[in-house]
A protein has these predicted regions:
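Active-site neighborhood of HAD-like aspartate-dependent phosphohydrolases
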Residues: 1-52
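Acidic, Mg2+-coordinating phosphoryl-transfer loop and its flanking beta/alpha structural elements
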Residues: 132-166
């Protein structure tokens, strides 16, 4: 059975939406997804506000309240019928996120066994046929086939198969 690894943030969980919401509320601004086209949030806001961005990510409840990406639950459940599915999240970038990410996955994806959740900073260690991720840095080093999940920051990235949503993931893997 072929193996698919799936990133969590910006693929299964809308971390960017929550990050924008908290940033905009804190500063009374209206930064939008369109403002981020081809850029990370960190590149759009002034460097004197990076500490607030970091504090948002490190807040205890940040990863608990993320919205689920539309159709991800249904499609991942279907994928499990034909593939070995693992969740691979780069939690090392925000060490305070381990427990919250686990709780979030248990709440929204209870059908994914704990043994299929991998916390890793460098996804080149994964042994899988496919990796679905929004971060091209992770795909570059991955040994299998990288699938780029669209997010505002990666809109200018080429060189990978791209999916824009979970319906396209479903079509790609299940026809």
């Amino acid at each position: 059975m072929k193996r698919i690894c799936v990133d969590m943030d910006e693929v299964m969980a809308d971390a960017l939406g929550e990050h924008l919401l908290r940033y905009n509320q804190h500063f009374g601004e209206q930064v939008t997804l369109e403002d981020l086209h081809g850029k990370w949030l960190w590149e759009v806001v002034s460097s004197d506000r990076h500490a607030v961005l970091e504090a948002c990510l490190r807040s205890e409840d940040f990863f608990d309240v993320l919205a689920v990406m539309p159709e991800s639950q249904r499609v991942l459940r279907r994928l499990q019928m034909n593939y070995e599915v693992f969740i691979a999240t780069a939690a090392m970038e925000v060490p305070t996120s381990f427990q919250a990410k686990y709780r979030w996955l248990a709440k929204h994806f209870p059908f994914i066994p704990a043994s299929h959740i991998v916390y890793c900073g460098d996804k080149s260690i994964l042994r899988a046929d496919y990796l679905i991720d929004d971060n091209p840095r992770q795909l570059r080093r991955f040994k299998g086939e990288g699938i780029l999940y669209s997010s505002p920051h990666n809109m200018g990235v080429t060189g990978y198969k791209r999916v824009n949503d979970w319906l396209e993931v479903e079509q790609m893997f299940l026809g």
